[in-house]
Every structure is written in structure tokens, then in C-alpha cells.
């Protein structure tokens, strides 16, 4: 579920290079410029050579979550200091294209330099109406094998990774599960780079099912993955915690996977965590991490290194339980069990945020 608040008039990525003193705020997409009145839902990845790709929703007519919305991209060759002109990668006409979830596949022998996958959603009505059954969300991807210069035609994977009941739109969309609202992960998808599931691309997601329920308990977190470089996809089990929303995935040591997501119910103001020992197919445990306070807002999590056989994780969110304030970066040296280093970035009102692997943990 996307934020209704559009904070300020620019969208910024926080790039943490070494220490807090070196923190620098870079304006990548400025509202009211380059053909769009608003920019929301950022996502960012890097290629092995260091080139950065920033994606987001370019909202043509305003900051609302539904309408004429494109997926746009900029690139940087100098670690985010300067950025290219804007390019439109997905244009769904007057309808919505959103929830960009990019990832670089570095394990396909056909593409030794890597191939970028851009997963995204389309929608033909506002989220509240889709949640009532009056609309459809679909799931797609595009790829680029030349560093973002050109992009493939879109591939529709809705039948593999979604369970809509909209037979009037498509006779095949007649699933008993009756999933309605659907959103890919914010920030980025992920790929296992080692272990039992090396090469698996996992896209965290969330969906609503059936008629709307109080406190958004019709929502739940899930994900989907491919082990054959996008030829086929498999759905994960749902995380058995009602209200899961804006879900991100990160690799842990021992071929495990963590999901980290917001609690849309709002009764407990902390992040929800789910752990999988089989690469995200099912979930061993799910719990509220009281060390990660959250005001019901999107957060971002990323693996940034390894420490004595355990993955080093970086997590960034608004750490004020009352309002979307206190943007904080936290570092865990033990697969997210504890968070030892907490860096306060800004007290200002904040919404969507992402982190990228320019972090040095020494």
C-alpha cells in the first residue's frame, strides 16, 4: 500500500558512503520537471562496475497513487554524484504502471555481463476499488542485456505469480483465492549469489484477498521466484501474519531468506520479519522485531557484507512510531538478530526510502 502523503517536492536517495559525516543528499527526481508532476516509489540497483540505475513512478498529473503513471529511469556513472536525463521505460497509456522492482541477474551464462530484470505492476483502477473487486492488478517484467540502453518487450507473468478472480477480463483469471490488490516489493528484488539457491531471483510482494476487512487484515505478505532466469516462476507460501504490506527480501547466511515488512494493521508499531530456510518457498517463523520501530511506512533492507560467516545487513526506515520522522540507518552484523550500529540521518518527515550498496561497514 502506497503512502498518501507526498512529502516535500523532491525525491531523494540517501547514499551512505563511509561515515555519517560524509552523508550527502542527492536530488534524483524533482517533482514538476521532465514531464511529471510527482515522483514516487523509488528503486535503485547497481551493476558490478558501479553504474547506478534509479527507477520510480513518474506521476504525470499529480501525486495520487492511481492515474497516468509511468515507470521512469535515470542512471549514474559516478556513484550518484550526477544523473542522466530521464527515460520512460514503461508507459501504460493513461493507466497505472508502478511498483518497480529491479534486480541484476549475474548468474545466467548467456549474459556474462549481467541482465537487468525490471518487475512491475499495472492497474486499471485505484487500490481501494481493486480491493473491492472493481479492478485488476497484473504483474510483468522487462529485461535489458546492454546496461539499460535497450529493453525487451514486456512479459506478463500474472498467471504464475498472482491469483486474481476476474474472468470477465481474462477467462484464465478465475482463481478461487480471489487475490485483489497486488504490489511488488519496493526498492529492489534480490538474487542469491551463493549457497543452495545460487541464482534464484526472489521478488517479495503483498496482496489482499477477498472482501476488504477491518484494519487491513485482508492483506498478507508473500513472494515469487525463478530458478531459470525468468522462464518460469513459482509462488511462495503466504506469511501467516494478517496485515503484511510493502515487503522486502534479503539473503541471510546458510541459504536462508528474510522478509521485512510493515504492519498495515497498525496495532504493533514495529517491523514484521519472516525467515525461510528453503529460499523463500515457505516460512519457518514470523515475528515482530521490537528493535525496529515503525510508524506504518515503507522501509529498506540490503545485504552489504559478511562477518564471520553471518551476513551484514543495512536497514533504513522512519523510526518514529507516531509519525514518519527520524530516518535511521541500522547495521546488523549477525543476520539481523541484533542491530548494533544506529545512524540517525534526518528528523524531517520522510516517506519512501531506499538504500544501495555503496555502504562500507568498516
Model feature map: region roles:
Residues 22-362:
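Asp-box/BNR beta-propeller blade signature and adjacent active/binding-site loops
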Residues 1-23:
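Bacterial Sec-dependent N-terminal signal peptides
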Amino acid at each position: 500500500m502506497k503512502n498518501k502523503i507526498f512529502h516535500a517536492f523532491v525525491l531523494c536517495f540517501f547514499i551512505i558512503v563511509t561515515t555519517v559525516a560524509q552523508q550527502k543528499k542527492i536530488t534524483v527526481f524533482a517533482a514538476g520537471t521532465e514531464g511529471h508532476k510527482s515522483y514516487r516509489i523509488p528503486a535503485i540497483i547497481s551493476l558490478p562496475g558501479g553504474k547506478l540505475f534509479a527507477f520510480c513512478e513518474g506521476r504525470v498529473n499529480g501525486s495520487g497513487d492511481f492515474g497516468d503513471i509511468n515507470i521512469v529511469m535515470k542512471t549514474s556513472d559516478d556513484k550518484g554524484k550526477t544523473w542522466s536525463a530521464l527515460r520512460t521505460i514503461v508507459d501504460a497509456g493513461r493507466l497505472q504502471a508502478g511498483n518497480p522492482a529491479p534486480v541484476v541477474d549475474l548468474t545466467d551464462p548467456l549474459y556474462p555481463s549481467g541482465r537487468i530484470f525490471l518487475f512491475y505492476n499495472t492497474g486499471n483502477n485505484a487500490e481501494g476499488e481493486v480491493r473491492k473487486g472493481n479492478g485488476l492488478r497484473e504483474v510483468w517484467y522487462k529485461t535489458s542485456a546492454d546496461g539499460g540502453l535497450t529493453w525487451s518487450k514486456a512479459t506478463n507473468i500474472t498467471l504464475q505469480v498472482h491469483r486474481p478472480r476476474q474472468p470477465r477480463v481474462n477467462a484464465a483469471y478465475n482463481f478461487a483465492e480471489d487475490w485483489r490488490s497486488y504490489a511488488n516489493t519496493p526498492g529492489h528484488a534480490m538474487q542469491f549469489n551463493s549457497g543452495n539457491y545460487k541464482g534464484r531471483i526472489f521478488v517479495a510482494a503483498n496482496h489482499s484477498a477477498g472482501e476488504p476487512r477491518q484494519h487491513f487484515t485482508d492483506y498478507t505478505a508473500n513472494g515469487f521466484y525463478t530458478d531459470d532466469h525468468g522462464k518460469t516462476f513459482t509462488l511462495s507460501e503466504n506469511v501467516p501474519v494478517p496485515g503484511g504490506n510493502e515487503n522486502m527480501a534479503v539473503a541471510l547466511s546458510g541459504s536462508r531468506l528474510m522478509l521485512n515488512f510493515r504492519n498495515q494493521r497498525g496495532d504493533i508499531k514495529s517491523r514484521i520479519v519472516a525467515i525461510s530456510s528453503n529460499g523463500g518457498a515457505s516460512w519457518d517463523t514470523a515475528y515482530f522485531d521490537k528493535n525496529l520501530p515503525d510508524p506504518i511506512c515503507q522501509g529498506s533492507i540490503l545485504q552489504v557484507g559478511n562477518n564471520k560467516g553471518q551476513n551484514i545487513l543495512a536497514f533504513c526506515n522512519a523510526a518514529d512510531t507516531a509519525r514518519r520522522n527520524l530516518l535511521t540507518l541500522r547495521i546488523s552484523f549477525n543476520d539481523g538478530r541484533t542491530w548494533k550500529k544506529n545512524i540517525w540521518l534526518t528528523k524531517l518527515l520522510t516517506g519512501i526510502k531506499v538504500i544501495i550498496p555503496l555502504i562500507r561497514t568498516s
